[in-house]
Amino acid sequence: DLFSPETYRAFSESGQEISGFRENRRRSAANIKPGDRLICYMTKLSRWIGVLEVSSNYFVDHQPVFMEADDPFVVRFRVSPHVWLQPEKGIPISNDISWKHLSFTKDLQKDNTAWTGKVRGSLTKLTDEDGAYLERILIEQRESQKSYPLTAIDRKNLRPSVINSE
């Protein structure tokens, strides 16, 4: 489950009961069943931030949740968070605890971007091994609350975007 800093903030403030996806993910959503887990990744910070358990089949709802108006994330699931970390507690994908253990990163140099396809689209299925490993380290991180300091660029990326409409 991909979150931008903006959708992370919206989900965090919404009661954390609904996860939403764009209409073009409906086919993938149809394969998700109650009991499945969504491993959450924050774009712009490149961090693993959570584990959500799905508690419903998908449904379509146009009521804004993630954006104040014209919310594009209308393909939705009811979820319950098993892990939901603050950005500075999220595990950077480039940290060895993640990088050296995932099938799509472990054989790559850290400056290689070939892995990004695995996290570019929401509802991309991870291997069972990668999913179980990420769930385990995220649960451990929920307990330990180790800090992964944010860089200046990370802090800038977390700030809400302001669009000048004049």
Which residues make up each language-model segment?
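Aromatic- and Lys/Arg-enriched surface recognition patch
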Residues: 53-124
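ATP-dependent helicase/translocase motor core
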Residues: 106-166
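Compositionally biased, charged N-terminal/linker segments
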Residues: 1-34, 42-43, 140-165
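Short, Lys/Arg- and Gly-enriched loop/turn segments at beta-strand edges
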Residues: 46-53
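Short, compositionally biased strand/turn segments
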Residues: 32-36, 102-103
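Conserved beta-strand elements of beta-rich interaction domains across eukaryotes
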Residues: 45-46, 84
